[in-house]
Amino acid sequence: MGQIVTFFQEVPHVIEEVMNIVLIALSILAILKGLYNVATCGLIGLVTFLLLSGRSCSLIYKGTYELQTLELNMETLNMTMPLSCTKNNSHHYIRVGNETGLELTLTNTSILNHKFCNLSDAHKRNLYDHSLMSIISTFHLSIPNFNQYEAMSCDFNGGKITVQYNLSHSFAVDAAGHCGTLANGVLQTFMRMAWGGSYIALDSGRGNWDCIMTSYQYLIIQNTTWDDHCQFSRPSPIGYLGLLSQRTRDIYISRRLLGTFTWTLSDSEGNETPGGYCLTRWMLIEAELKCFGNTAVAKCNEKHDEEFCDMLRLFDFNKQAIRRLKTEAQMSIQLINKAVNALINDQLIMKNHLRDIMGIPYCNYSRYWYLNHTSTGKTSLPRCWLISNGSYLNETKFSDDIEQQADNMITEMLQKEYIDRQGKTPLGLVDLFVFSTSFYLISIFLHLVKIPTHRHIVGKPCPKPHRLNHMGICSCGLYKQPGVPVRWKR
């Protein structure tokens, strides 16, 4: 009985000790909450702004940018798409697979004496290689206004493909008006087919980009075994793919497809790769491995307006097709014929082809440059290194593009850092304990006052992460118009 009485006598003391501990804990929590309110009320932000005002808004990200390059090895795409290249002034090649291909020869010697092409009979007797013939068909159907059938001869004896186009003119009137003749149309199509390689035997006429001149009288297309034919230029699929996507009867479908469906870069399991994309040794020339972060890959998956993104799609398509479909040459050609509009931007290819003909620096889809931020390790989306007069431009020729790319990288990093900072909510559990202390009341007062921390241009949204001075300009160069009205905001 005495023990029970003693226990109840001690209960008030126990409660008092517990209350003291609770009060101490609540006081600590209230002080922490007060510190948090002071940190978020704008006072510290105001002091920071005043200290940083007038300095570059990208100071924390300023560092050393390295200009780096990569060169793609497109020879590895030969199993799923035709590759074009050049051996010398008159011999050009289309590679299909590892053992076969087509030879496109500019010559003054005719090898076919007749002026007809019995294609239906050859097809009925299955005389030719269908994968090679589909490439020739694409070439022939791309010739504009082909209406002089005597200008074309073909022969399929023993399965050997021989197609001959007559580039000479029978009449002086045709020679004088070459630019509108069938011969010019054949040469135009040949230039587009061989583009990405070289067509050094041709002259664009200099005064008119769509008028192609040559001293040769015949263009002969024959099947051939594959050897080391690519001596003058590296193999590239861009010429054939551009020709394929630009076929007149497919233009409307092409435009619709570009707006509704594109190839999405994927990982080894076929899933989208938000974490980045790596080019391995077999995709590159004289390099081991190049990886690009999720920012670059996300841009490629969202947009269809960069040459580098087109090449990533081609490499990814090639990898998936070889592993999943294990297609033969004929099936591969059929597949790329159907998929081309989803893989590449035909307008980009045509633009670069026209720039080449007109003597303007153009992209040959082979070499690219990008910036590497040394302190963060982040890289920009590679951009094509343009070519002029047969050689790559000097860095000084596109220094403005390099500077703009650096500014874009800084802006993207600042925006990402700001979004991450806004998404954090420190001390969320403290909001459960709202008790009044003197410090807490002061912090509440400061929080309600909402001390302004930065300037806004009147009538425009928040400029963060950029910092404006009293003239309404930012030292990083984005806001360039001085004297605009500004006001302070929290």
Swiss-Prot record:
Pfam family, one: Arena_glycoprot
Cytoplasmic side: 34-58, 453-490
Annotated site location: Important for GP-C-mediated membrane fusion: K33
Site for Cleavage, residues: S58, L59, L258, G259
GO annotations of cellular component type: host cell endoplasmic reticulum membrane; host cell Golgi membrane; host cell plasma membrane; membrane; viral envelope; virion membrane
An example Gene Ontology biological process: virion attachment to host cell
Domain of life: Viruses
Glycosylation, residue list: N78, N88, N98, N108, N118, N166, N223, N364, N372, N389, N394
Disulfide bonding pattern of the chain: C85-C230, C117-C154, C179-C211, C278-C291, C300-C309, C363-C384
Keyword Zinc: yes
Molecular function per GO: metal ion binding
Segments traversing the membrane: 18-33, 432-452
Annotated Zn(2+) 2 binding sites: H454, H456, C462
DNA damage as UniProt keyword: no
Binding sites annotated in the UniProt record for Zn(2+) 1: C57, H466, C474, C476
Lipidation (N-myristoyl glycine): G2
InterPro entries in UniProt: Arena_glycoprot, Arena_glycoprot_zinc-bd
Intervals, Extracellular compartment: 2-17, 59-431
Annotated keywords: Disulfide bond, Fusion of virus membrane with host endosomal membrane, Fusion of virus membrane with host membrane, Glycoprotein, Host cell membrane, Host endoplasmic reticulum, Host Golgi apparatus, Host membrane, Host-virus interaction, Lipoprotein, Membrane, Metal-binding, Myristate, Transmembrane, Transmembrane helix, Viral attachment to host cell, Viral envelope protein, Viral penetration into host cytoplasm, Virion, Virus endocytosis by host, Virus entry into host cell, Zinc
Family listed: Belongs to the arenaviridae GPC protein family.
Descriptive protein name: Pre-glycoprotein polyprotein GP complex
UniProt lineage: Viruses, Riboviria, Orthornavirae, Negarnaviricota, Polyploviricotina
